[in-house]
Amino acid sequence: MNVYLTDGTPACFYTAVFSACTDKGCIVTPARDFQIPLGAALIEVVTDTEKSARVQKKLRAIDGGAIREISLILRRGCAEREMTALEYIRLLVERKAPVRDMLSHPAVLEARDAIKKVTGEAHNFTGFLRFMEGENGVFYAPFSPDNDILELILPHFL
């Protein structure tokens, strides 16, 4: 079994997918405090823009909306986000067609759940986030989301 350690960026994740997609039973994680299974080989993934671009090009050819969905999955605040995205990508590559409507498949269900949690939290914060004026006249809104949603809600406030 191989464990692919990424740096947490989407480009590094897609670089890991280049090898991990065909490596059944592997684990992709950015966690440095990950409990390594007995006998597992650790592979430190270094971002390779060529491999990352090839994976993204293949995904766009299969399903144009898959890149956005995977981007939302990778914004999830849980440790399993890379594995959820990897299983979704494996299913896309296996079927060679969009799979978002295969709601009985566990990988699709898990991916849709992750997407729903990220987009739902972003929607909630656009409605409930309140700004305060600082001493120097700058407005700010302290908040602590469960997921990485700042880039998703920013256009709403500009």
Regions found by a protein language model. Name each.
Residues 1-49:
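N-terminal ordered "arm"
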Residues 2-3, 30-32, 47, 51, ...:
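Extended, charged helical/alpha-beta scaffold domains that provide interaction surfaces
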Residues 21-24, 58, 62:
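Generic N-terminal helix/loop capping motif
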